[in-house]
Curated annotation (Swiss-Prot):
Biased composition (Basic and acidic residues): 377-389
Name listed for the protein in its UniProt record: Chloride channel CLIC-like protein 1
Subunit structure comment from the entry: Homomultimers. Interacts with mitochondrial protein PIGBOS1 (via C-terminus); the interaction occurs at the mitochondria-associated endoplasmic reticulum (ER) membrane, a zone of contact between the ER and mitochondrial membranes, but does not appear to play a role in ER-mitochondria tethering and is not affected by ER stress. Interacts with CALR.
Keywords, ordered alphabetically: Chloride, Chloride channel, Endoplasmic reticulum, Ion channel, Ion transport, Membrane, Phosphoprotein, Signal, Transmembrane, Transmembrane helix, Transport
Gene Ontology MF term list: chloride channel activity
Residues modified to Phosphothreonine: T482
Site, Ca(2+)-mediated inhibition of channel activity: residue positions: D25, D181
Residue list for modification Phosphoserine: S438, S464, S532
Natural source organism: Bos taurus (Bovine)
Function: Anion-selective channel with Ca(2+)-dependent and voltage-independent gating. Permeable to small monovalent anions with selectivity for bromide > chloride > nitrate > fluoride. Operates in the endoplasmic reticulum (ER) membrane where it mediates chloride efflux to compensate for the loss of positive charges from the ER lumen upon Ca(2+) release. Contributes to the maintenance of ER Ca(2+) pools and activation of unfolded protein response to prevent accumulation of misfolded proteins in the ER lumen.
Pfam families linked to this entry: MCLC
Lumenal side: 19-184, 238-329
Topology term for the membrane: Multi-pass membrane protein
Length: 542
């Protein structure tokens, strides 16, 4: 009986449990399975008291706390994964950076590492960044999949050419800022300064342009001589270095001592062939300095050739381009007439240039002052004119006779100047006789006065015919009228004894003053005349 009751209770529980599975709770949609149409079985909750199971109000709070717990566990797992991944990442990158730092230490150790004496060392290195290197670095920094080997190769090729830091190279430089060498700027400014000095001081006015042009050509020729010698020496040195490089395989052969078999072979080679001895060429290159290959005569010949041909080359090149461009637009039938016209034009230009050479002599430099014309009505008075150009730079004659104005002359200057001019005129006559040359320039009135002394003119009514036979009566010194001393007699003025008394008596006469001016201009009476202009004036006034 008891067994039957127990069996009935079990069956009732089983049927009740089956009915519970088919029942759908509308408030518990989380456990509802839409595919089977039944409610899911709730899991057994451990650690939950019976009071909580019984209380339906706390079901949502329990589910929320369960979700938070699950979220915390997932976050913890993610952190653990990140840590593990970071450890793996660092384990792969550490060897790369170790090798990179090791390379830096090896390169700097060659130059010297800091020690107790030198606490700081400054090095310079070059960085070469390729595209593949840049991609590997970007992958590493962004956390993408990167390869340690590729990154290691990229870092090892970045830093090269380690050297000590040169503080001078980092200073400010003139050529880097302006793009011009300071030496060239200095030379240009020096040339400009020379030109400004010439213009400001007017030195070019004292030297003729033709002389300046000759000097410029001469200086240019001297500079070109040294220039071409240095150029030829550089060429010879470069050729010598190239020949030495070609003869390098013969260093060991020609340096060794030759035995009997080698000498026999060399004799046969020189006897039966026309080839030069390579060792002779080798020792010539070894012993002969290239400086001996460029003598001054060679530099002189090259300089003279370039001095003549180089300008003609440029002229010919320009003329060829001009003719080519001109003939390109002209028909073929007109080529010959155009060439003939051009040849005639060139010949005309050369002829005109040759005719104008004489005009170039008058360009530049001060000209000599033209002699003044003779004054009408009286003899030209000898004026104190500077007949030499002012002293200048090199070529001009030196100025030694200053101009003296009448205000600055003293009472005895007229007599002194007249005597000096007479002496100069005597020297001119002697130069004509002996043929000597002098830098002194003869003026037209010098020749006229010399002819006047040789052929004196007789003034009618003022000169007595008997005066020539009585020279001593007028106060002349005896013996001065001999033919052998005619030049000396003509150079010294007559000294009449009674001239002073006569001049005192007729001081206010205009004719006397005019005669005195003529005496000052002529420097003395004419040769062969015994009466002075003053005495003649006395007769006229008297």
């Amino acid at each position: 009986m008891l067994y039957s009751l127990l069996l009935c209770e079990c069956l009732w529980l089983i049927t009740a449990y089956a009915h519970d599975d088919e029942w759908i709770d509308p408030t518990d949609m989380l456990n509802y399975d839409a595919a089977s149409g039944r409610m899911r079985k709730s899991q057994v909750k451990y650690g939950i008291s019976e009071k909580e199971e019984v209380n339906p109000d706390l079901s949502c709070a329990n589910e929320l706390s369960e979700c938070y717990n699950r979220l915390d566990s997932l976050t913890y797992k993610i952190d653990e994964c990140e840590k593990q991944k970071r450890k793996d990442y660092e384990s792969q990158s550490n060897p790369v950076f170790r090798r990179y730092l090791n390379k830096i230490l090896i390169e700097t150790k060659k130059l010297g590492l800091p020690d107790e004496n030198k606490h700081d060392m400054h090095y310079d290195a070059e960085i070469i960044l390729k595209r593949q290197t840049l991609l590997e670095i970007q992958k590493f920094l962004s956390g993408e999949d990167w390869k340690p080997g590729a990154l290691d190769d990229a870092l090892s090729d970045i830093l090269i050419n380690f050297k000590f830091h040169d503080f001078e190279t980092w200073k400010w430089r003139f050529e880097e800022f302006f793009g011009v060498d300071p030496y060239n700027v200095f030379m240009v400014l020096l040339c400009l300064l020379c030109i400004v000095a010439l213009v400001a001081t007017e030195l070019w006015t004292y030297v003729r342009w033709y002389t300046q042009l000759k000097r410029v050509f001469f200086i240019s020729f001297l500079i070109s001589l040294g220039w071409n010698w240095m150029y030829l020496y550089k060429l010879a040195f470069a050729q010598h270095q190239a020949e030495v490089a070609k003869m390098e395989p013969l260093n060991n052969v020609c340096a060794e001592k030759m035995n009997w078999s080698g000498s026999l072979w060399e004799w046969l080679r020189s006897s039966w062939t026309y080839k030069d001895d390579p060792c002779q060429k080798y020792y010539e290159l070894l012993l002969v300095n290239p400086i001996w290959l460029v003598p001054p005569t060679k530099a002189l010949a090259v300089t003279f050739t370039n001095f003549v041909t180089e300008p003609l080359k440029h002229v010919g090149k320009g003329a060829g381009e001009f003719i080519k461009a001109l003939m390109k637009e002209i028909p073929v039938l007109l080529h010959i007439p155009v060439l003939i016209i051009m040849a005639l034009a060139v010949l005309s230009f050369c002829y005109g240039a040759g005719k104008s050479v004489n005009m170039l002599r008058h360009v530049g430099g001060p000209e000599r002052e033209a002699p003044q014309a003779l004054q009408a009505g009286e003899r030209r008075r000898q004026q104190k004119i500077d007949y030499r150009p002012h002293g200048g730079a090199g070529d001009a004659d030196f100025y030694y006779r200053g101009q003296i104005s009448p205000i600055e002359q003293g009472p005895n200057d007229n007599t002194y100047e007249g005597r000096r001019d007479v002496l100069r005129e005597r020297d001119v006559g002697l130069r004509f006789q002996t043929g000597n040359k002098s830098p002194e320039v003869l003026r037209p009135f010098d020749l006229q006065e010399a002819e006047a002394r040789e052929h004196p003119k007789v003034v009618p009514g003022l000169k007595s015919p008997n005066l020539e036979s009585k020279p001593r009566e007028m106060g002349e010194i005896p013996g001065e009228s001999t033919p052998t001393e005619s030049s000396t007699e003509s150079s010294q003025p007559a000294k009449p004894v009674s001239g002073q008394k006569v001049s005192e008596g007729v001081e206010g006469c205009p004719a006397v003053e005019k005669a005195q001016l003529r005496t000052d201009a002529a420097g003395g009476p004419e040769e062969g005349s015994t009466c002075s202009p003053a005495s003649t004036a006395v007769e006229v006034c008297g």
